[in-house]
Amino acid sequence: MAIKIDGDINQYIKLVGRSDESVKTEVQHIIDELGCTPIIQEIDEEFLACDETKTNWLLRDSGVDFAWENDRLEAIFLYTQHLYAEYSVYSGSLFSQFSNTATRDDIVQCLGKPEGQGKWNQSWIRYNNPNGTWTNFEFDDDLRLRMVTICMPVV
């Protein structure tokens, strides 16, 4: 069952899965607002299927990555804790009901039972969005939010 998450996270949720002309313009607008220049990382074609392209727009100074596949925005990664030396923490408030470093229990209390959960490298929970995408919450060892991923469902 899809759940609507309140807050500025929606500016990102509405973009994932789109490949229309305006999606890159909307992403560029966000980049301009964040005030940084992305590092464009093209994935080598020898690792991809025929006629497939994958590109990552890394906004390390803002704690955001955009992952593109064949001109469709496949995923957005928002780093809410300092995970990697080269990345800053996302500074904006993403959620109206809880903080960017809320506990797993706080998030479940606000959003209800997750659609998926597990532990792969770190503990995570997943909610389905109304637009058919997923929002994944990944937690540190103290079960505090460390990264939010909005992505297309894994098939």
Annotated model-derived regions:
Residues 2-77, 83, 99-155:
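A cross-family detector of function-defining hotspots
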Residues 85-87:
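Preference for well-ordered, secondary-structure-rich cores of eukaryotic proteins
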Residues 92-98:
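Short aromatic-glycine motifs in intrinsically disordered, low-complexity regions
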